UniProtKB/Swiss-Prot annotation:
Gene responsible for this protein: gnptab
Domain DMAP1-binding as annotated: residue spans: 696-804
UniProt repeat feature LNR, residue ranges: 443-478, 508-538
GO cellular component: Golgi apparatus; Golgi membrane
Molecular function terms from GO: calcium ion binding; UDP-N-acetylglucosamine-lysosomal-enzyme N-acetylglucosaminephosphotransferase activity
CDD domains cross-referenced by the UniProt entry: RRM1_GNPTAB, RRM2_GNPTAB
Positions marked as site (Cleavage): 893-894
Protein name as annotated: N-acetylglucosamine-1-phosphotransferase subunits alpha/beta
Record-linked InterPro entries: DMAP1-bd, EF_Hand_1_Ca_BS, EF_hand_dom, GNPTAB_reg, Notch-like_dom_sf, Notch_dom, Stealth, Stealth_CR1
Quaternary state and interactors: Hexamer of two alpha, two beta and two gamma (GNPTG) subunits; disulfide-linked. The alpha and/or the beta subunits of the enzyme constitute the catalytic subunits.
Species this protein is from: Danio rerio (Zebrafish)
Record remark on domains: The DMAP1-binding domain mediates substrate recognition. It specifically recognizes a conformation-dependent protein determinant present in acid hydrolases.
Role according to the record: Catalyzes the formation of mannose 6-phosphate (M6P) markers on high mannose type oligosaccharides in the Golgi apparatus. M6P residues are required to bind to the M6P receptors (MPR), which mediate the vesicular transport of lysosomal enzymes to the endosomal/prelysosomal compartment.
EC number annotated for this UniProt entry: 2.7.8.17
Primary enzyme class: transferase
Length: 1219
């Protein structure tokens, strides 16, 4: 203690001594400052060290909207921002600019008309869009309405005298006009929509004195101008799973089918139209429905059908082009979309809202996580502004300052419905996740994308818009050949459209392309029995309607019933999954694929083929992850079974079936046709003495045993007679008559062979082979040659594996196409007309509709400039035709669809012809570097898109062009990278082991000694012929690598790169890989709803989202805001938003506040004024503080000055002369 006190006193004394020194105070102050600075530096070093050690905890996972760590959920610790594009359609300044742009377009149109020598004020009549029907169960019926009415005494048989188009009419009705009962119209009923559509098109040319309209049917009897159809009725209430007319007809009660002449199913509306025999039948059906009329436990409802033909009297037209605030009204979708981000995606780092300078009135601009970006901030060429085109704006959003490399782009009408994570968009293992929907619109009418570059010159595709059928109509390729739609062609994401025969040329259902089957999308057009319910894509609910076969380990032959086209094989009890599958190419195959999700193998067959066998080679993976290979055959016979109790005319064997397409050719006279061929022949067939095959029933398949057991039960119960029993049993056992004898003989030979010794067996086999060679027998009759195998598509095989599997050529396909090139081209050309008339019903979320407008700007959704753009394009086309008589142009129908076709043509020219689909309307994750690379690839096209003031037919569609560039870009093979991959020890020189690895990569397995010696000889020859400055052999130590062959030089990277024979083999063995990884996703998590003005329909759409929440929700506003029900629809929509996201987000101001400025220019001017005011205010405050201090502490300041700067004192005793 004494020592401590002594040290303290010493420290005190030294401190006083230092302070009493002349410069002691300065030293103390300097030491204090140095200590503070050192403390800060030390703290900074500590923080940096802690950040380096715990940067994951401090930065990546907490740098987000929520400000908390998502370390347990995020798989990508990278910052991800969100970009919105938003506009306020009710802004007065914006409406003025829109009027100015429209006026400018009208002036350009007027100038074009003057150049053509036409009246500048004359407007060409443009095709107007059909108004929307807002009535309940409103459908277009098979009815034509003629105004004024035909003579009252005319009959249906006399209609062809007026016009040949009416020859297919089945009924004629004289109907009084509801609003004018004194006058009437004539309603013509047809059997189908196709007949009505064709009659409408043809009658417009013949009957110029009558107005011909299509008739509409509805159940809403309260609407004005309706006429009840007594022989038509609506049927509803049946299960929605019934997608085909025949399915519904079979299940309907007899009381309904007995009173109907025809049934038409509208699966999209879940209703059916009944053509009744008499008017009394409707009364009987309604009474029966009140008692008991059910189908699969559901009550059926029969309703009256009301006819109307004037849609303008029912609903208001959507062609009103007046510029009004209500037309482009904002429903505050952005507010609720931001709430969905805070609720379901709080890991987002920052939110950028791109506007034309507008500011949402409710947006909290003080929030550091949100920023408003104007067009001036991102457009490189300011002369392109102002712009009212969404593609032009989207072209520049990746140039936002401070934007993350990967960002998510959303429109304001898109939001999240469930928790979303970055791996929903991108993962390091599989790359970008691409969500695709409906196909790109056809390049020309009647020319689907699957016809382009398929080896045939198709008439409908032989035009400039389709690049002359992708080259099929130019040169020798027009006569057939290996097209782009066969397996192995196209991109890895392009699935095979079929296997053998005509599978790629005919569809299993109207509107269901073969390439849509098993493509991981549930296509509505393919979700029917004829297509096997999209072969597993639409779940397993309807698999019970297909023929099921259970695979067994020890069974190698399965036999299908005659006429069966849609079987599937279940391996649930056999293995866990299928890792690889091959099938022998066969003409009867339409499609086959594996669905590991349901543990099934699906098979679709073409009808009308004789008995044959399909051979499978499947690699299964058991539950313990051990692979085993199973080979089996399927015996098929797709000819239809003969129908009993019916007589059919005998068709001449040499006659080819003619397509049922109406042609203007004259009728063929029947004088030259023999009498025996002018009528049907009655086949006299007696069933009295039916020969039932006697077989060993224990060897029959289980399915046949079950059918025989049921047949015996029916006979014992008296349901069938002996004759029927024998006839049915003979039909069941007929396919196994010859097969059973061969099976028994094979089993017997097998038993005898097992009794012999191995030497005796070998001697017998050689003797048998020798005898067969001497007699010239064909051994292949008993054991067929293993056919060429093609890979089978598997649902969960990765993209890389799929491309590897599908890179196998089909040797029989080219020969088959060459044989059928003549008649197939003719059939397709004739069928194209039928394809135009009978449009497919489309796919849910996968069909193009002109109302499905992808622009986020409200005037694009309302098609405000559409009429002007169509007129300008028509005039430009006419001007081009005037200048060049040989030029032809395609009439613009829809700007968005034409821009898709335009981009598709560019992609075809850059990456090759293939079928493409449009990305879903949902949030898209974009990589800035990839987007910049895309724009560097098409610089002129993107610059042209940026220059368009309004949407144009030659715009580069943002998501479509980006994702297909990402999926199509190819990484050129780099020999240096291949060398580095093989050089596993990174020594720069390949060893003997590594040379063998190289040999396995460039040669087929198994390797032979000749393969290795030839490779070594190539390297030796190249080392002698190439200069040393290329091979760098002199830089390698002689002892670095020792080879078995002493003459072998060191295999350096330079030697491999410059050795031409080696590089050629490497290029042949190593294919160019995709530059970017990607994964095709389904649409299970996407909910796209087109919100129109029908209140009940909108409520049903929103309730569907409530019941089935999805991750990505888009409510596309297509409301007619001037309609009387628009307010109700918007209220329902607002109520839905509030029910989904009731809590305000941090990006909103309180409800009682709103932004003072609604434009960025006003805000920026105010901020400049604020900053200036703040600067001068600070200056004044500093001045006041200085004067105040000087006034109150004047004496102290003088003393401080004297103390800091003391005067020098002159000593009185100092005498310079004194020594």
């Amino acid at each position: 203690m004494l020592v401590v006190n002594s040290l303290l006193k010493l420290l005190q004394r030294q401190t006083y001594t230092c302070l009493s020194h002349r410069y002691g105070l300065y030293l103390c102050f300097g030491g204090l400052v140095l200590m503070i600075v050192s403390a800060f530096q030390f703290g900074e070093v500590v923080v940096e060290w802690s950040r380096d050690q715990y940067h994951v905890l401090f930065d990546s996972y907490r740098d987000n909207v929520a400000g908390k760590s998502f370390q347990t959920r995020l798989c990508l610790p990278m910052p991800i921002d969100v970009v919105y594009t938003w506009v306020n359609g009710t802004d007065i300044n914006l409406l003025k600019d829109l009027r100015a742009v429209r006026q400018r377009l009208e002036e350009e149109q007027k100038a074009l008309r003057e150049r053509l020598g036409k009246n500048g004020s004359e407007i060409t009549e443009a095709p107007k869009g059909r108004p929307e029907c807002l009535l309940s169960h409103c459908i277009m019926g098979p009815v034509l309405v003629l105004d004024p009415a035909l003579p009252a005494n005319i009959t249906v048989k006399e209609l062809p005298t007026l016009s040949a188009a009416f020859s297919s009419a089945k009924e004629l009705l004289q109907v009084a006009k509801p609003l004018h009962p004194s006058s009437s119209v004539t309603a013509l009923l047809f059997h189908s929509h196709t007949e009505a559509e064709k009659a409408h098109a043809d009658a417009l040319k013949d009957l110029l004195t009558h107005s011909i309209s299509r008739g509409y049917l509805t159940t809403d009897k309260e609407a004005p101008g309706l006429v009840r159809m007594h022989t038509l009725a609506y049927l509803s209430g049946f299960p929605a799973s019934l997608k085909e007319t025949e399915q519904l007809r079979v299940k309907l009660p007899a009381v309904v089918t007995s009173k109907t002449k025809k049934l038409q199913l509208y699966s999209e509306a879940s209703i059916a139209l009944l053509h009744l025999n008499t008017a009394q039948d409707f009364t009987d059906l309604t009474q029966q429905a009140k008692k008991n009329l059910t189908l699969d436990g559901k009550e059926l409802t029969v309703s009256s059908a009301f006819l109307f033909w004037d849609l303008t009297a029912i609903s208001q037209s959507k062609q009103d082009e007046d510029v009004s605030a209500s037309r482009f009204e904002d429903n505050e979708e952005l507010r609720y979309s931001l709430r969905s981000i805070e609720k379901h995606a709080p890991w987002v780092r920052h939110i950028f809202i791109v506007t034309n300078g507008q500011i949402p009135s409710w947006l909290n601009l003080d929030n550091p996580r949100v920023s408003v970006v104007t067009h001036q901030d991102i457009f490189q060429n300011q002369t392109h502004l102002p712009t009212f085109s969404s593609p032009a704006i989207e072209t520049h959003i990746h140039r936002i300052p401070g934007l993350s490399q990967k960002f998510i782009y959303l429109n304001d009408d898109v939001m999240f419905g469930k928790d979303v994570w970055p791996d929903d968009f991108y993962s390091h293992s599989k790359g970008q996740k691409v969500y695709l929907t409906w196909p790109v619109p056809n390049c020309a009418e009647g020319c689907p994308g699957s016809w382009i570059k398929d080896g045939y010159c198709d008439k409908a595709c032989n035009n400039s818009a389709c690049d002359w059928d992708g080259g099929d109509c130019q040169g020798s390729s027009r006569f057939g050949g290996a097209g782009g739609s066969v397996i192995g062609g196209g991109q890895p994401w392009q699935f095979a459209g079929g296997l053998g025969g005509l599978a790629g040329m005919s569809f299993c259902n109207q509107g269901c392309a073969n390439s849509w089957l098993a493509d991981k999308f549930c296509d509505q057009a393919c979700n029917v029995l004829a297509c096997g319910f999209d072969v597993g894509d639409c779940g397993q609910d309807n698999l019970n309607q297909l023929h099921r076969i259970v695979l067994r380990r020890n069974q190698t032959l399965y036999t299908l019933p005659q006429g069966e086209l849609r079987p599937y094989f279940s391996f649930s009890g056999l293995a866990n999954r299928v890792s690889e599958a091959h099938v022998a190419d066969n003409q009867v195959l339409r499609h086959t694929s594996v669905a590991n999700k349901w543990k099934t193998i699906h098979l679709l067959l073409l009808p009308g083929h004789n008995a044959t066998q399909i051979h499978y080679n499947i690699t299964f993976q058991s539950t313990d992850h051990h692979d085993f290979i199973m080979t089996f055959s399927v015996s098929v016979d797709t000819r239809e079974l003969p129908k009993s109790n019916t007589s059919t005319p005998v068709r001449d064997k040499e006659e080819e079936p003619k397509p049922t397409v109406a042609t203007p050719e004259p009728e063929v006279p029947f004088e030259a046709v023999p009498k025996e061929k002018q009528g049907p022949k009655v086949r006299e067939q007696t069933h009295g003495d039916v020969q039932v095959p006697v077989l060993n029933e224990t060897l029959l398949p289980d399915e046949v045993k079950i059918e025989l057991k049921k047949l015996n039960e029916k006979l014992m119960s008296g349901d069938i007679t002996i004759k029927g029993f024998n006839l049915t049993k003979a039909m069941l056992l007929e396919p196994y008559k010859e097969k059973d004898q061969f099976t028994l003989k094979h089993e017997k030979d097998k038993e005898e062979k097992q009794k012999l010794s191995p030497v005796a067996q070998l001697q017998n086999e050689r003797a048998a082979a020798r005898v067969k060679r001497e007699k010239g027998e064909n051994v292949d009759q008993l054991k067929p040659v293993a056919p060429s195998l093609v890979p089978v598509q598997i649902d969960d095989v990765t993209t890389k594996a799929q491309s590897r599997l599908f890179n196998i050529e089909k040797p029989h396909m080219f020969h088959l196409l060459s044989n059928l090139k003549g008649n197939l081209s003719k059939e397709r050309d004739s069928d194209s007309e039928g394809h135009l008339r009978e449009r497919p019903t489309g796919r849910r979320l996968q069909f193009y509709s002109d109302s499905l407008n992808r622009g986020f700007l409200p005037w694009e959704k309302r098609k405000f400039f559409q009429d002007l753009m169509e007129e300008v394009n028509r005039l430009q086309t006419e001007l081009q035709y005037t200048a060049d008589r040989t030029a032809t142009g395609r009439r613009l129908q829809d700007t968005f669809a034409d821009s898709l076709r335009y981009v598709n043509r560019l992609l075809n020219a850059q990456f090759g012809f293939t079928s493409r689909k449009v990305p879903a309307h949902m949030p898209h994750m974009i990589d800035r570097l990839i987007m910049q690379e895309l724009q560097d690839t098409f610089p002129q096209e993107f610059d042209k898109t940026s220059s368009h003031r309004v949407r144009h037919s030659e715009d580069m569609q943002f998501a479509f062009s980006y994702f297909y560039f990402l999926m199509s870009a190819v990484q050129q093979l780099n020999i240096s990278e291949v060398f580095d991959e093989i050089d596993t020890d990174h020594s720069g020189v390949l060893s003997d082991r590594e040379i063998r690895t190289l040999a396995t990569r460039i040669h087929e397995l198994p390797l032979s000694l000749q393969d290795l010696t030839s490779l070594e000889q190539m390297l030796i020859n190249c080392s002698k012929s190439l200069p040393s400055n290329l091979t760098h052999l002199h830089a390698v130590s002689p002892t670095q690598e020792a080879y078995y062959d002493p003459s072998m030089p060191p295999v350096t990277k330079g030697l491999v790169i410059h050795c031409k024979p080696i590089t050629e083999r490497i290029h042949k063995a190593f294919k160019d890989q995709n530059k970017y990884k990607f994964e095709i996703m389904g649409e299970e998590e996407i909910a796209f709803k087109m919100i129109r003005t029908n209140v009940s329909h909108v409520v049903g759409q929103l309730d569907d989202i409530r019941k089935n929440p999805r991750k990505f929700i888009c409510l596309n506003d297509n409301i007619d805001h001037i309609h009387k029900d628009a307010g109700t629809v918007k209220a329902v929509l607002r109520d839905f938003y509030e029910s989904m996201f009731p809590l305000p987000s941090q990006f909103e101001l309180p409800r009682e506040y709103r932004n003072r400025f609604l434009h960025m220019t006003e805000l920026q001017e105010w901020r400049i004024y604020r900053d200036k005011l703040k600067f001068w205010t600070h200056c004044v405050l500093v001045t006041l503080v200085v004067f105040t201090v000087m006034s109150f502490f004047a004496e102290q300041l003088v003393m401080l000055k004297r103390w800091l700067f003391p005067r020098r004192r002159v000593s009185k005793d100092a005498n310079p002369e004194r020594v």
